[in-house]
Amino acid sequence: EVGRCTVVARPDSKAPLLADVSLEVDSATHNSEAQSWHVNLFSPHLPNVGQATLIRRLMTHVAQDPPSGLMHYPTRAGGHPARAAAAQWLGTAPLGSFGADDVVLANGGQNAILMIFQTLLCGRRPAVLVEELAYLGFRRAAELLRADVIPVAMDAHGVIPEALEAAAKSHAAQIFCTSPEVHNPTLAFTPQPRREALAAVARRCDLHILEDDCYRLGAAQAPGYRMIAPERSWYISSISKSITPALRLGIAVAPEGQAAALRRTSEYSFFGLATPLTDLAAALLVHPELPGIMDAARLRIGTYVQRAVNILGAFDLIWRADVPFLWLHLPEGWRAGAFVQAAEGQGVRIRAAEEYACRDARAPHAVRFAINAGLSLDSFEAGLGRMRDLLDNPPDVIGV
């Protein structure tokens, strides 16, 4: 009403600043039944092929005689064996020349992303460039640091160089986040010529590159960005998709000459990883049984992938035998949101493409579903069979 004063409501002190969006990803709870009608395919769940037994054994040894003791703060010198073990574990990754002094350990891959952002982002309104569809952890980490997240257009080979250059210049961006070996969620692979073109853009625009390699279980198919552009490329991996997510062990490799800045971020944030964990990592990552265990896990994942292809292969399904998730373009008649809801009604939990897109971006009518090896093959196949029935019978809805 004209003439009345402006009324300002008192802020609700109980309301959170940001929506409480859970990032919980455990798709098979501890001691849950392998036989289940409910099939959670949100995130991969590794098969237990001996790693739990090995970890328990090594934890016992560490507890009996911890190399770092139990009464001391973490130190750089004390953490060196774990960093050296991590560098050896990454030895086959095509990252160029690096060693233990280039490695900084983190509390999982997500923490490694956040630490790199904390190290690099500056200014009143920093900007992070991500792929058009991208791992949502990039967005969550950027949001924590009040950074703008800018999606960049892609084609079948990854981000388009011209689109990256345009976005970098128009937003004064500082870092480009990418998963060139196993793109999450589409499984796309970025070949070497495209990587070199993107690295050239990064040099022209003074962009850092963050390469997330957490989902690669097999051999790399092209040089990593740290080999192509060693002065500006940060690399992260973790043991969550290959050994276990329970230990929350992430590995970051800094560009040449920049590890000190990342170590400073780590030490200023939490002093360093807990010493029992670094002692365990130092033993686990170089243990002679570990390569065989990882091979067995990869083969078991491949079995689940093949069963999924047997059931859903008649549809537009994208898969790789050594990647623990699949990407499904929905047939005519289905929208991603409606299909996810219908699948949940049949006891199957999957992710819509829009979860990987920025808020105002367009997303295809596609879904991602992960390999849950915590379920029996029978339960896994039964859940996918119910998905197939839905795909074969889209809803007959006519909008008016």
Tell me the role of every PLM-derived stretch.
Residues E1-H61, E267-L273, A296, R300-T303, ...:
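N-terminal basic, amphipathic alpha-helical segments
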Residues I55, W234-R298, N393-D396:
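Conserved core segment of the aminotransferase class I/II
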Residues G69-C205, R216-W234, D392-G399:
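Conserved core of the PLP fold type I
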Residues Q110-N111, A361-A366:
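A short, glycine/Asx- and small/polar-enriched loop/turn
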Residues V130, P151, I209-E211, A281, ...:
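Hydrophobic residues in well-ordered beta-strands that form the structural core
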Residues V253, W327-H329, A370-N372:
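Short hydrophobic/aromatic beta-strand micro-patches
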Residues R298-V309, L317-H329, A342:
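Conserved glycine-rich beta-strand-loop-beta hairpin in the small C-terminal domain of fold type I
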